A protein has these predicted regions:
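Acidic, metal-coordinating catalytic segment for phosphate/diphosphate chemistry
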Residues: 2-31, 35
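Short, glycine/serine-rich, charged loops/turns that create anion-binding
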Residues: 32-37, 46, 97
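Conserved hydrophobic "DFG−1" position in protein kinase catalytic cores
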Residues: 32-33, 41, 135
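Nudix hydrolase/Nudix homology domain
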Residues: 48-49, 53, 122-175
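Unchanged
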Residues: 62-87, 94-150
Length: 175
């Protein structure tokens, strides 16, 4: 569902022409699943000062100075969805590093947490930030053209985690 008055840009690359300054930061993101295994995603605002505006992405955000990442995610989910969780209810899944040395900056981490919401339905979630929210089956979500690419990769890893775990233990692919 989209927030009241929200609209998605039809131009498939308009954000690429923006001259707005982007400010990389350490960040956290939720691989947020409902009991039916759909992933809950945020339609990002059209603000040109954020990475991938007008794209579907994971809920989450910047880690504040001195803040543990798990607590940052708990805070962000409260702000963005009015969901109250404890750090014990979020499980670290993976972490990506981004090297912004080309811009005179350093490494920035994006830490992904698996979060199950068995007691929630997407209709019961309250959007506090972003242009919209929706729940998607993994196959549909990963086939969509306007998904934040690094979030899409983390979602694919989460969805395929059983296959990846088997391969890392040395199992051979029968194909």
């Amino acid at each position: 569902m989209l927030a009241k008055g929200a609209r998605v840009s039809n131009s498939s690359g308009s954000f690429l022409g923006s001259r707005a300054t982007l400010r990389p930061a350490h960040a956290v993101a939720a691989l947020l699943q409902l009991s039916d295994d759909r992933y809950v995603m945020q339609l990002r605002d059209s603000n040109p000062t954020i990475f991938y505006p007008d794209h579907w992405g994971c809920f989450g955000g910047a880690v504040e100075a001195g803040e543990p990442p798990a607590l940052a995610l708990v805070r962000e989910l409260e702000e963005e969805l009015a969901v109250t969780l404890s750090p014990a209810e979020v499980a670290r899944f993976t972490e990506f590093s981004f090297d912004f040395g080309f811009a005179g900056d350093g490494i920035r981490l994006r830490t992904y947490y698996a979060v199950r919401l068995p007691r929630a339905d997407v209709d019961g979630l309250v959007l506090g930030e972003g242009a919209g929210l929706a729940a998607f089956e993994p196959e549909r979500l990963l086939a969509m053209p306007r998904v934040v690419p690094y979030d899409a990769f983390a979602l694919w890893m989460h969805h395929a985690r059983g296959r990846i775990a088997s391969a890392s233990r040395g199992a051979r692919d029968p194909a």
